[in-house]
């Protein structure tokens, strides 16, 4: 992928916890993170040359400040705007709403897993979602169901999730 992808901490930590951090390298090539995210992911995510820290050169956008997000989400949103990132990788609902208001393209953890299946990088989404949930990653059951339906790994009446 050639466009710059700015990442928040939560999805990076989630992929590390399920042993799939390298999948992000495969999918994106390089991820850009602001300093607050770099601090949040250590020591959970070991430093990697394809996770590049980039400092903000402008103040955090007022719309972002008003959203009362965490430092990582705030800096990731502002950096994505500042450098005109092609994609923002973030899971938190409030941050995704602000991103939409700012005109940013967004993907979350489940979206990356679906894309990885579509492109043949993983065979199934369900085992990785199950492991995310075992590791304490919270996602609305409705979103899990939607993702598994999109991955053709669950029928509309399957209630395992």
How would you name each of these model-derived features?
Residues 2-87, 93-96, 100-105, 127, ...:
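Active-site-proximal, substrate-binding regions of enzyme catalytic domains
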Residues 110-154:
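Hydrophobic alpha-helical interaction segments
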């Amino acid at each position: 992928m050639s466009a710059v992808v700015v990442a928040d901490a939560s999805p990076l930590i989630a992929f590390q916890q399920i042993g799939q951090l390298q999948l992000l390298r495969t999918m994106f090539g390089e991820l850009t993170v602001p300093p607050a995210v770099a601090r949040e992911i250590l020591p959970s995510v070991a430093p990697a040359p394809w996770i590049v820290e980039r400092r903000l050169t402008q103040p955090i956008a007022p719309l972002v400040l008003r959203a009362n997000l965490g430092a990582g989400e705030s800096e990731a949103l502002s950096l994505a705007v500042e450098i005109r990132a092609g994609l923002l990788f973030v899971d938190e609902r409030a941050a995704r709403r602000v991103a939409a208001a700012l005109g940013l393209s967004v993907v979350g953890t489940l979206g990356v897993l679906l894309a990885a299946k579509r492109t043949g990088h993983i065979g199934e989404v369900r085992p990785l979602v199950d492991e995310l949930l075992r590791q304490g990653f919270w996602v609305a059951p409705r979103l899990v169901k939607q993702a598994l339906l999109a991955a053709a790994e669950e029928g509309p009446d399957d209630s395992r999730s």
